[in-house]
Amino acid sequence: MPCNRSRPSLYSLSYIKRGKTRNYLYPFWSPFAYYLYCYKYRITLREKMLPCCYKSITYKEQEDLTLRPHCCLPCSCLPCSCLQCSESLGGLQVGRSTAQEKDHSQLKELYSAGNLTVLSTDPLLHQDPVQLDFHFRLTPHSSAHWHGLLCDHRLFLDIPYQALDQGNRESLTATLEYVEEKTNVDSVFVNFQIDRKDRGALLRAFSYMGFEVVRPDHPALPPWDNVIFMVYPLERDLGHPGQ
């Protein structure tokens, strides 16, 4: 019997969820007591045709298009769009429930040596993207922060405000050394907004350090808009270091 039904229906809705969560590593009066987060979701209602042409079922797909790392409030309030959590980092493909978001909202100390402290939301063997925060102590009262996401042997780092300062360069060197020695990351990606005033200086500085510009349509990149990515490939032997 011929099928007279039209094509299956498809409806899609996107929305953004923003907020802040408590960082219990610091007292509530500390400027680092809270982290900002931003999630972008897409809900799809899809009608699926059954073998019988007169019946169909509708099921819901929920996809988390954008997972942005929690940025501490002092970083997000700096006068530079690249560090505002709501504008800078957006988008690794991952699905999470509300309960999982609560579990992942608290960063725990993963490593500490010298001036470098590494915080993580999940064990590094987890399959979903994991937030890694690198805090590098500059003075007794100040530190440089690199906020990033670890996903499938790739680490995505947000370039902090005044990244070309000497202290931030030292913090990046310490971060790269940790990533190479303590994780199974193959490539480190840094990103910054296209409209940054120091874009030219960032391109020159990171190129000098061994980073290369990545074309926007590269399959390894998340779908972030108006962002320039640069990659630093880590030279590995036959095996990856275990965590």
Swiss-Prot record:
Coiled coil: none annotated. One of its GO terms (biological process) is negative regulation of stress fiber assembly. SUPFAM superfamilies: Acyl-CoA N-acyltransferases (Nat). Disulfide bonds: none annotated. Transmembrane segments: none annotated. The modification Phosphoserine is found at residues 6, 9, 12. It comes from the Eukaryota. Ornithine decarboxylase (ODC) antizyme protein that negatively regulates ODC activity and intracellular polyamine biosynthesis and uptake in response to increased intracellular polyamine levels. Binds to ODC monomers, inhibiting the assembly of the functional ODC homodimers. Does not target the ODC monomers for degradation, which allows a protein synthesis-independent restoration of ODC activity. Stabilizes AZIN2 by interfering with its ubiquitination. Involved in the translocation of AZNI2 from ER-Golgi intermediate compartment (ERGIC) to the cytosol. Interacts with ODC1 and thereby sterically blocks ODC homodimerization. Interacts with AZIN2; this interaction disrupts the interaction between the antizyme and ODC1. Interacts with GGN. PANTHER family: ORNITHINE DECARBOXYLASE ANTIZYME, ORNITHINE DECARBOXYLASE ANTIZYME 3. This is Ornithine decarboxylase antizyme 3. It comes from Mus musculus.
